[in-house]
Amino acid sequence: MWPQLLLLLLAPRSGHGCQGPELDRELVLAKVRALFLDALGPPAVTGEGGDPGVRRLPRRHAVGGFMRRGSEPEEEDVSQAILFPATGARCGDEPAAGELAREAEEGLFTYVFRPSQHTRSRQVTSAQLWFHTGLDRQGMAAANSSGPLLDLLALSSRGPVAVPMSLGQAPPRWAVLHLAASALPLLTHPVLVLLLRCPLCSCSARPEATPFLVAHTRARPPSGGERARRSTAPLPWPWSPAALRLLQRPPEEPAVHADCHRASLNISFQELGWDRWIVHPPSFIFHYCHGGCGLPTLPNLPLSVPGAPPTPVQPLLLVPGAQPCCAALPGTMRSLRVRTTSDGGYSFKYETVPNLLTQHCACI
């Protein structure tokens, strides 16, 4: 009596051959491994421990830092800004022309620059002041032989202070003053007043002789707090937007998952042990069919005959005598395109795993 009762309790109910709790994750991973190996074959073993060899490259190319498909290596955030003197008096303007002419006779030229907010917010790596001297090469050589041709000063709260600089290569009748590293913070001020002393230079009102500053900048390095945030330990496996959407869904009743449905699982190739073989994407959402194949009714369908009970939904492609099972609809499976390497990153290969991702499930 008791053995017969036990067999009756363990026997599956009619029409629910695939019913049961959600599949164990290890079972799903084993199935995924089999599908990949069947489509791509086993990975090439070139290193110790059964994994493809690791290419010894800088950190940017190390495992876990592979470039995204269609993207270029990350470039440093650098820029160049050209600053002209703020609008004001020039040699040809009146009534300031007399004052500027007197300054020119003394060999002192005053220029006011207003660096932009973008320039002030960045780290200045180099800066050059281009100044039109009006002297040819012979005149420049004669002036340099008798003493320094150019002196550069900056106006501060303590008065004019010398700006360390050096002369570089320049076109004829021009001088290029390279500011020293200690003078670069001057370009982080809202207003920069430069005083240039050149006894042999003349003041020119021509637009093409306007002096200008060239500043090369880059993004400031992250602060200590930002570096600490960036150094936070990584998650056990890479997340994807699809995985986050799954987590953000409202909870569903357990009964919803009792019948045939499409289940999802976020799988990373690191979890599969293939992160040195399959380098992109780092993870994907694996869809599979699961659930029972009872004969539920559709409450939204109208009754065919008034007073008659609802018509049950018939399983698809049901052969007489066969038991329906929750499975993917034929012809609706999608492929997954991956990028693999067999030499640790020296070369890559694009491959396709066909019929991997389930789109629609039904009792078949």
From Swiss-Prot:
Dimeric, linked by one or more disulfide bonds. Activin B is a dimer of alpha and beta-B. Inhibin A is a dimer of alpha and beta-A. Inhibin B is a dimer of alpha and beta-B. Interacts with TGFBR3L; this interaction regulates female fertility. Proteolytic processing yields a number of bioactive forms, consisting either solely of the mature alpha chain, of the most N-terminal propeptide linked through a disulfide bond to the mature alpha chain, or of the entire proprotein. Disulfide bonds join 260-326, 289-361, 293-363. Glycans are attached at residues 144, 266. It comes from the Eukaryota. One of its GO terms (cellular component) is inhibin-betaglycan-ActRII complex. Its main location: secreted. Transmembrane segments: none annotated. GO terms for molecular function: cytokine activity; growth factor activity; hormone activity. GO terms for biological process: hemoglobin biosynthetic process; regulation of cell cycle; regulation of cell population proliferation. The record marks 60-61, 230-231 as: Cleavage. Residues 1-17 form the signal peptide. InterPro entries: Cystine-knot_cytokine, Inhibin_asu, TGF-b_C, TGF-beta-rel, TGFb_CS. It is found in: Secreted. Keywords: Cleavage on pair of basic residues, Disulfide bond, Glycoprotein, Growth factor, Hormone, Secreted, Signal. PROSITE patterns: TGF_BETA_1, TGF_BETA_2. It holds the Pfam family TGF_beta. This is Inhibin alpha chain. Residues 18-60, 61-230 form a propeptide. Belongs to the TGF-beta family.
